[in-house]
Every structure is written in structure tokens, then in C-alpha cells.
């Protein structure tokens, strides 16, 4: 019986047997769809605001890093909870799984207090660092105060989504994002422009629509969590904060917070370098909204590729592991090539969606073409980073993330702005991405001579 079970087992898991391209697409498409919805959330706000007032668009471009920081804290902590809950469920330790989920909701309060204080006291100084234009500062204050002071909805929604995912439920978290995004898209024009019974509220209206979308997403998630989910139960009845549970959550969660915060720090740095031109700051803001449509599918792809590489590494199937890496890179490059072609062929139309002024158009068109040269090397770099995570080389993936988004790009951008002017800053993107890819290839070659070399031995 034992032998029979062993002979059957390899056929049970599709990750070891299914044709590779089909397997990658099957595992990646739900994540790609989910990530694209998140990208849509960001872009819709900006399109409506840009068509309402160019100063409003500049203000929300400057506000964007703080929104990213909020998501980094919320999602990073939630990743820690997800890891803890899924491990305890695997161990059949349901009491600790429930306790972990309850701790997760309590950490939402910690995170919320941080961003409530930022919303109340830090918004004006933050906006004033970048611009003396009072209209932009005031729009930024309106937008950020609402988004940060009501961030509890977003923080709880992200936590509950990740907790549901820990139980293997991928569909409802995706639906909650979709529901929130649709509500946001409906209320954005109504509240910004004042359509029908709604007053014209401009940038403030965009903030309210965003928060209302997050509130609806949170309510949807909580309803599923409390009424449709039988795996994990939250109870505050005899709840006590447990230091070792919190430690287990943050051991995984804190590095994830750091990884996700890097992008926020990078944009704050680039905004400071570009501060000599409001139009350049706006162009960077528009670029980041649009590039999320290209990068988010790639991040969705890596969520599908990671377990495939990890599984085949564990099963010592070197050929399949390399096949997953190769096909992952090819699919990633195809996604990024489409993005590059669009940035080269229709930059004017892309910028015009945001109601771009002539000034923004003059800076934005060449900027988009230059920056998009980084897309294809970035695709390969992202999949290599996924490989390092999948085979347990987390430090290499952390080094890669730091290099891509901080260590290389900011010094290069600063030097280019000093030697030439702010219009040369855009070249920092492809230069940094190219060197990051070289580093990734060096790491990979090192692994092929070390850890991966021994994978053949058991097969033969």
C-alpha cells in the first residue's frame, strides 16, 4: 500500500506534471487579474482628477508615496499573518490559527494609529517639502487627510483578504477588490464633478470615493469572513496579546513591510530630485499610475511561477525548474514588450487621458519613451528575484529589490540631474534596471555552480 501511494503521489500534484506553459498560465491568471484590478484603483482616481484640475493631479502625484507606504504596512503585516495562519492550519493546530487571525485584526489597530497620526499632523509639512504652490499643497492636504484618517477600512480589508487566502480561498479576496474598485469608479466622477444630486467636491471628492470603495470592499470581506468561512474563526472573548504569536507574525511581516516600502522611498527621492519642475513631478506621477498596468501583471505572473519553481526545486526536477524560469521570463518579456510598444507609439494619448497640459506633454512624451526601455530587463529581473525567493535565497531577492529601487536608481538620477538637468533623470530607470539584471544573472550563475549542481545527482 505504501509503495502504491508513493508511486501515485507524483501524479497528484499538477506542479510536477502539467505542461509548463499551461501550468504557469493556470496558476498566474487569477493573480494577474487581481493585480490589474489594484492597478485600476490607482489610475481611475488620477484620470478624473487630471481632467478636473492639473494642480490636483500634481498634488495626488506627490501624495502617492504615502498611499504606497500605507499599503506596504498593511500588506506586509498581512503577509506575516497569512504565513502564520496557513502554517498552523497545515499543522492542524486550529486554536493557534484562530489566535493568529485574531492577532491579525488587532495589528490593524496598531497600523491605523500610525497613519491616523500622519493624517492629522504630517500632511502639511510633507506637501510643503516639495512645492510652494499653495493650490497644490491644499489639494494634497484635502486628499491625504481623508485617505489617511479613514485608512482603517483599507487596512482591515487587506488583512481579511490575506487571512482568507491563507485558507486557500483566492476567489473572494479577488471579488472584494473588484467590488471596491467598481464602487470607486462609479463615485469618482459623481463626487469630483458634482453630477446629479452630488455636490462638486473636486480632489476631496476623489478621496471620499476612494475611501468609500475601500469601506465597501472591507464590508464585503468581513461578511465572507464571518459568514462563509469555516476554516478560521476570530474571537475576542478570552483574547490576550501573545508576544510569541506577534513575533511569529512580524518575523515574516516586517521584511515584507520593508520590501514594499522601498518603492515609496524611491518615489519620495525622485520627487525631491524633480522638484524644480511641477510638470516633471506630475509626469512621474502619471508614469507610476500607468506602469502599474504593466508591472502588476508581471507581479501576478511571479505569484504563479514561485510555487512551481519551489515545488520542482524540492522534487529535484532541475529540468522543470529551469523550464519554469525560462517560460516565466518569456511570458514576462511579452507582457513588458506590449507596455514598451504602447509607451513608444501612443505616449500623447496616454498622457491626454489625465488631461495633461502642453507643459506635461512636452516633458512626458520623451520621458515615457526613455523610461519604458527599462521594462524588458525588469521583466527578467523580477522573475530571477522570484527564483531566489522560491529556492529559499531570500537575502538575494532582498538585495535585488534594494538595488532595483534604491541603491542604483536614486544616486544615478541625482548625478544625471546635476551633470545635465532634470530631463536626464529618466535615463536612470533603464541604466539601473540593466545593472540590476546583470547582478541577477551573476547570482543565478553562482547558484548553477553551487546549489543547483547537486539537483541532477538524485535524478540520475
Question: What annotation goes with each model-predicted range?
Answer:
Residues 1-28, 85-152, 198-254, 309-374, ...:
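Short alpha-helical transmembrane segments in multi-pass integral membrane proteins
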Residues 17, 21-40, 44, 66-73, ...:
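Residue-level signal for short hydrophobic patches within transmembrane helices
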Residues 26-45, 146, 180, 213-217, ...:
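Transmembrane helical elements of multi-pass membrane transporters/channels
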Residues 36, 40-58, 127-134, 190-201, ...:
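Helix-terminus/linker motif at the lipid-water interface of multi-pass membrane proteins
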Residues 57-117, 154-173, 283-347, 378-400:
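Small-residue-rich hydrophobic transmembrane alpha-helices
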Residues 69-72, 184-189, 218-222, 293-296, ...:
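Hydrophobic transmembrane alpha-helices of multi-pass small-molecule transporters
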Residues 78, 82, 147-165, 173-181, ...:
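Short runs within selected transmembrane alpha-helices of multi-pass transporters and secretion channels
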Residues 119, 162, 188, 192, ...:
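Structural signal for membrane-spanning alpha-helices in multi-pass inner-membrane proteins
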Amino acid at each position: 500500500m505504501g509503495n502504491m501511494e508513493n508511486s501515485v503521489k507524483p501524479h497528484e500534484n499538477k506542479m510536477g506534471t502539467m505542461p509548463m506553459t499551461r501550468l504557469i498560465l493556470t496558476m498566474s491568471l487569477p493573480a494577474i487579474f487581481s493585480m490589474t484590478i489594484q492597478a485600476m484603483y490607482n489610475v481611475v482616481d488620477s484620470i478624473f482628477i487630471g481632467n478636473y484640475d492639473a494642480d490636483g493631479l500634481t498634488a495626488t502625484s506627490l501624495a502617492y508615496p504615502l498611499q504606497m507606504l500605507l499599503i506596504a504596512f498593511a500588506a506586509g503585516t498581512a503577509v506575516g499573518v497569512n504565513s502564520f495562519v496557513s502554517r498552523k492550519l497545515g499543522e492542524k493546530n486550529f486554536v493557534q490559527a484562530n489566535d493568529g487571525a485574531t492577532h491579525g485584526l488587532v495589528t490593524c489597530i496598531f497600523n491605523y494609529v500610525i497613519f491616523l497620526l500622519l493624517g492629522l499632523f504630517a500632511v502639511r509639512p510633507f506637501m510643503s517639502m516639495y512645492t510652494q504652490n499653495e493650490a497644490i499643497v491644499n489639494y494634497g492636504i484635502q486628499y491625504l487627510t481623508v485617505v489617511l484618517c479613514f485608512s482603517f477600512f483599507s487596512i482591515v480589508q487587506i488583512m481579511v483578504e490575506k487571512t482568507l487566502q491563507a485558507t486557500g480561498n483566492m476567489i473572494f479576496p479577488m471579488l472584494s477588490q473588484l467590488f471596491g474598485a467598481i464602487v470607486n469608479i462609479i463615485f469618482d466622477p459623481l463626487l469630483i464633478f458634482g453630477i446629479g444630486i452630488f455636490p462638486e467636491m473636486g480632489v476631496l471628492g476623489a478621496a471620499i470615493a476612494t475611501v468609500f470603495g475601500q469601506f465597501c470592499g472591507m464590508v464585503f470581506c468581513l461578511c465572507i469572513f464571518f459568514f462563509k468561512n469555516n476554516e478560521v474563526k476570530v474571537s475576542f472573548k478570552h483574547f490576550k496579546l501573545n508576544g510569541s504569536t506577534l513575533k511569529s507574525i512580524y518575523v515574516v511581516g516586517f521584511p515584507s513591510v520593508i520590501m514594499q516600502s522601498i518603492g515609496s522611498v524611491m518615489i519620495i527621492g525622485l520627487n525631491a530630485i524633480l522638484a524644480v519642475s511641477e510638470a516633471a513631478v506630475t509626469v512621474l506621477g502619471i508614469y507610476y499610475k500607468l506602469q502599474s498596468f504593466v508591472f502588476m501583471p508581471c507581479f501576478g505572473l511571479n505569484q504563479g511561477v514561485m510555487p512551481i519553481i519551489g515545488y520542482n526545486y524540492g522534487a529535484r526536477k532541475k529540468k522543470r525548474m529551469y523550464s519554469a524560469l525560462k517560460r516565466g521570463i518569456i511570458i514576462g518579456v511579452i507582457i513588458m514588450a506590449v507596455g514598451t510598444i504602447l509607451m513608444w507609439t501612443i505616449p500623447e494619448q496616454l498622457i491626454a487621458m489625465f488631461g495633461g497640459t502642453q507643459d506635461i506633454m512636452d516633458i512626458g512624451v520623451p520621458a515615457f519613451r526613455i523610461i519604458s526601455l527599462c521594462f524588458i530587463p525588469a521583466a527578467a529581473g523580477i522573475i530571477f528575484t522570484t527564483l531566489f525567493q522560491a529556492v529559499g535565497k531570500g537575502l538575494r531577492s532582498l538585495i535585488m529589490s534594494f538595488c532595483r529601487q534604491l541603491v542604483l536608481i536614486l544616486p544615478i538620477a541625482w548625478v544625471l540631474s546635476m551633470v545635465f538637468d532634470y530631463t536626464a533623470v529618466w535615463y536612470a530607470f533603464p541604466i539601473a534596471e540593466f545593472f540590476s539584471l546583470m547582478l541577477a544573472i551573476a547570482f543565478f550563475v553562482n547558484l548553477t555552480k553551487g546549489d543547483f549542481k547537486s539537483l541532477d545527482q538524485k535524478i540520475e
